[in-house]
Amino acid sequence: MKITFLGANHEVTGSCTMLEAAGQRFLIDHGMEQGKDVYENEPLPVAPGEIDFVLVTHAHIDHTGLLPLLAHNGFRGRIYATTPTVELCGIMLRDSAHIQEFEAEWKNRKGRRAGAEPVEPLYTIQDAEAACRLFVGVAYEKRIQLAPGIEARFVDVGHLLGSASIELWITEGSTTTKLVFSGDIGNHDQPILKDPAYIQQADYVFMESTYGDRIHGPRPDYVGELAKILQRTFDRGGNVVIPSFAVGRTQEMLYFLREIKEQGLVRGHGNFPIYIDSPLATEATRIFQDTDPDCFDEQTRALLEKGIDPIGVPGLRISVTSDDSRMINTDRVPKVILSASGMCEAGRIRHHLKHNLWRPECTILFVGFQAVGTLGRTLIEGAETVKLFGEPIEVRAEICQLTGMSGHADRDGLLQWVEAFTEKPRRVFVIHGEDEVENIFVNTLTEHGFTACAPYNGAQWAIGAEGAVCLQEGTKVRMEQRAGEGTNRAATVFQRLVSAGKRLLRVIEHNEGGANKDLAKFADQINALCDKWDR
């Protein structure tokens, strides 16, 4: 079999690995690159129509965000994921498509005034819906056959609702080799989700390393800290505005807010209102509430058995329309506002910041990672003014963080996961980590007796009975340009064109033996298209 590392190698986003084994060609994840780009992802080396199926570890866009593009360019196979992941992808991929369409529309409005060529969205809502129709839901712990000689099992890894490690048994000839893809390994003792499950055996392991260089430290008292922030803000007559990731973090905050209200930890403010002002967060919350209780941890299941909704909070109000959102800030009653995006780069949260940042009685509470260059990072680093909707806003609100909240295991958690194998795997491939972090974690694994390496994007390895052999090292050269719009987007769009060309060749081959009249018409259409673009 052959393994090609296409994305999230020596960087964190854009996860994608291609396997060619037992006569099949398939992907583990197909994610979108986000934030700062260090090493450019490799384009698919084959046409999307030549991919037989995809396995998805979890619903985050950096693991799934290019699936609509894959469908647009001719992929028609099945996409296997756990049932909660299928549900979450149904809303997250559509939301991603809306963002792509909105950004293209905005650029075209500006471009028309400058006489620029129209910009096409990376993909559309129709592409997202086409991808969603290809999903097949799979239960945890159920071993399934994907093709002759290929079996898989999804194991709960505690990172996000539906997240999984994937066990693969691949039989070629008389030899069966077991691969394990860790997915994103969850943190221990987090609300709602189970702790990561451990796997007993593997020949080769592909594991993430996001926090492979650090220790989270003791778990903070989230409920106590949050209650203190609410108390002092409400006593001042202000709002607590929480920029929050729509899927996962918003539901954790609802869990904590329910506990605060049940225990009466905020005094003198009665049943203070809590607003969810994010359509995506609202849909995600519904999915959490409708999910099989077996997906949750023991404490959450115990609440459900008592008839208690773990994320159902008295005083919770759902903001659906834009008018609903605007009305929130006309009411001066102290309140909690949960809104996306979590890094304040887009979405309704920016309107709430405009209305609350300048008020010294209010608090802006960050509960997740803030990437360099984002508005959220600017605020926590002490900016005195920021610009929102073209208007300078003075930062007079209290800015604070609820630290220690992470959906990723730290170094010790990663070691605990990999050391659970009863015998050491023949090799551990370290992926999904920043450049230096991957190198540090490879050294850590080596010190613990593992054979480990950190491949680069484009690396190829052959795995057989004799072991694993590196066929190609991949690209070690860092990108000159860091983020988003330039080299990476251009390469992605050009790859769409290449894929379209490969698809055209397949269509030509399928028409062999057709009526001469039809073939002549087809040839004329192709030549006319070539004449238009051969410039």
Set out the residue ranges of the language-model regions:
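Short, compositionally biased "basic patch" segments
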Residues: 191-206, 293-300, 370-396
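Charged, amphipathic alpha-helical linkers/stalks
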Residues: 458-521
